[in-house]
């Protein structure tokens, strides 16, 4: 089986995963993070050729007169998954990484609707809707979370690339965490003895921008503070391909039944650390490189 790939995007042509009924087409929603209308060559960009995303545009429909209820992380995702205006929920604002889940688990959501229609549902990538009840122990199963929102499977990051905790969460459990080195997160103060981007610039491989003076993970300064969980920390360069592999596995595993996948790209949100094979490829610096990583030339993975 061949799976089409657009940089870090999935191509899912009709029938490639065996749609069993025309009335139940497979559905994949891809939501990029901080990608502008003018960043794509199918909408007129010339500096970077986003041929992968262009293929989706050319083989489908383009919304040239469309509107969104919000254009930032948490509010846009809240609105997409609940059908609610984000201003109807005071908590639907850009959240810290340790925020509580802001979606009422008793409310109908898009994945719940899909599941009730016979779909298996999955979420891969950026989450940023809060987790738990606001007092999360990251070393224990996290409840409520993506499952309670309506996803049968999830492999997510809690918030954004630049916010702690810098770990992956699969089906409500921190990936790679050990009782010998538990993870702690705080958004008010640092943990004693832990280096930060503000106080230890010599440990950084990029200059900290405003607000990014917190914990250092993978040589990158973050928002907020975390301690421990060293073996579970992500390497920014590997995030795109790992999310892709998890998404592909979900589609392959469920190819004989209708599926719904929410695929939250983490690109091109800061800190913009592309995989080594994309560094310098765009000629437009790190932001251009991660756009190319996420929406650039189509490749094929067997």
Regions found by a protein language model. Give the residues of each.
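Formylglycine-dependent sulfatase
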Residues: 4-5, 10, 16-302
């Amino acid at each position: 089986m061949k799976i089409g790939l657009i940089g870090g995007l999935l191509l899912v042509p009709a029938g490639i995963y065996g749609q069993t009924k025309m009335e139940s087409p497979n559905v994949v929603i891809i939501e990029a993070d901080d990608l502008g209308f003018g960043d794509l060559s199918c909408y007129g960009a010339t500096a970077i050729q986003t041929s992968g995303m262009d293929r989706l545009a050319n083989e489908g429909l383009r919304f040239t007169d469309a509107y969104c209820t919000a254009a930032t992380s948490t509010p846009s995702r809240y609105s997409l998954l609940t059908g609610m205006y984000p201003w109807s929920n005071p908590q639907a604002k850009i959240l810290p990484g340790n925020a509580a889940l802001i979606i009422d688990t008793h409310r109908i959501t898009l994945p719940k609707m899909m599941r009730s229609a016979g779909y298996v549902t999955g979420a891969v990538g950026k989450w940023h809707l809060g987790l738990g009840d606001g007092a999360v122990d990251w070393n224990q199963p996290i409840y409520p979370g993506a499952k309670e929102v309506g996803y049968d499977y999830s492999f997510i990051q809690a918030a954004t690339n630049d916010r702690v905790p810098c770990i992956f969460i699969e089906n409500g459990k921190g990936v790679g965490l050990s009782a010998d080195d538990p993870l702690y997160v705080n958004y008010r103060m640092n943990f004693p003895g832990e280096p930060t981007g503000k106080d230890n610039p010599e440990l950084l491989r990029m200059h900290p921008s405003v607000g990014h003076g917190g914990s250092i993970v993978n040589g990158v300064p973050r928002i907020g503070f975390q301690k421990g969980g060293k073996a579970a920390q992500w390497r920014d360069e590997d995030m795109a391909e790992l999310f892709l592999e998890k998404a592909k596995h979900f589609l392959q595993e469920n190819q004989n039944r209708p599926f719904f996948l929410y695929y939250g790209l983490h690109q091109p949100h800061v800190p913009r650390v592309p995989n080594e094979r994309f560094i310098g490829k765009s000629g437009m610096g790190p932001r251009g490189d991660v756009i190319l990583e996420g929406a650039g030339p189509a490749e094929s993975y067997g």
